[in-house]
């Protein structure tokens, strides 16, 4: 994912910053404790498409 897109995208729940995790193909919102999937290069920024981040993931 290109940095210019990360600068534009925000969490739809908190409007906060997102972190790109290339290994999992996800965008993480630590504030919302959600991970939004990226499928075929397209981020799915819907709350019902996101998965909850575990406490271990949040500490990493």
Swiss-Prot record:
One of its GO terms (cellular component) is cytosol. SUPFAM superfamilies: Trm112p-like. InterPro entries: Trm112-like. Gene3D superfamilies: 2.20.25.10. It holds the Pfam family Trm112p. HAMAP family: UPF0434. Belongs to the UPF0434 family. This is UPF0434 protein NMA0874. It comes from Neisseria meningitidis serogroup A / serotype 4A (strain DSM 15465 / Z2491).
């Amino acid at each position: 994912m290109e940095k210019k897109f990360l600068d534009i995208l925000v969490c739809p729940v908190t409007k906060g910053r997102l972190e790109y995790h290339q290994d999992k193909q996800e965008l993480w919102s630590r504030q919302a404790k959600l991970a939004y999937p990226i499928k075929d290069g397209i981020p799915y920024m819907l709350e019902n498409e996101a998965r909850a981040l575990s406490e271990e993931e949040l500490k990493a």
